[in-house]
Amino acid sequence: MLEVEAPLEIVQESSRKLLGLTNLSEAIKPIIEAENPNPNSLCLLNHKETLSHIIPGSLGLPNFKKVETLNFQMVKEYPLLTGYPLLKQKDIGINTTGVLLKQLMVNKSSCYQDGISTISVPVHMPVHPMVMPTKVSSGSLVTKLTLLFPPMFRQGILLFKKLSLLGFRLVRFCLKAIMLKAQEGLLLIAGQVHVLNHVDPIIVH
């Protein structure tokens, strides 16, 4: 059998059709890129290498011992977020760490399961301006009356002596008026004690 060598142009044309290439430069482009790589692609490769040499547990810092030829112009610095410590109150000098922790515990205890927090506020009962709360009991009221009676008795005795000099009828009239006033005062005191302490009224004989 005779072997016929095909021309070079026909072989190249057929190979381009098989590879789906329309231009000779497209077929030679991968070879040129392999011999002369693009500097941008090298930067990307260096960046990938730095990511591959990150030490676990070092907060994302690269290991400069393994990678010595880094392109520092392409590397960006990202500062880590720092937690600010609890500060002291100004012009006091007292550390408020304990107070803040107590507030956090109170807020945590007053939270529901769905994340809604509640604030416990003491309920103040409305007080009417005319009705003032008093803590006067019947015993303390009696002691106050017993302290007031001796000077009243002294004044009454002096008045009785003066009236006795004027006549018996006038003395009897004044004593009757004094007894009526005393009964009226006792009835008023009994009503006030009953309203304040809700006890049975004092029976005056």
UniProtKB/Swiss-Prot annotation:
The lineage of its organism: Viruses, Riboviria, Orthornavirae, Pisuviricota, Pisoniviricetes. InterPro entries: Corona_nucI (IPR004876), N2-like_embe-CoV (IPR044311). GO terms for cellular component: virion component. Pfam families: Corona_I. This is Protein I. Keywords: Virion. Structural protein that is not essential for the viral replication either in tissue culture or in its natural host. The keyword Nucleotidyltransferase does not apply. Belongs to the coronavirus I protein family. It is found in: Virion. The gene encoding this protein is included within the N gene (alternative ORF). The keyword Secreted does not apply.
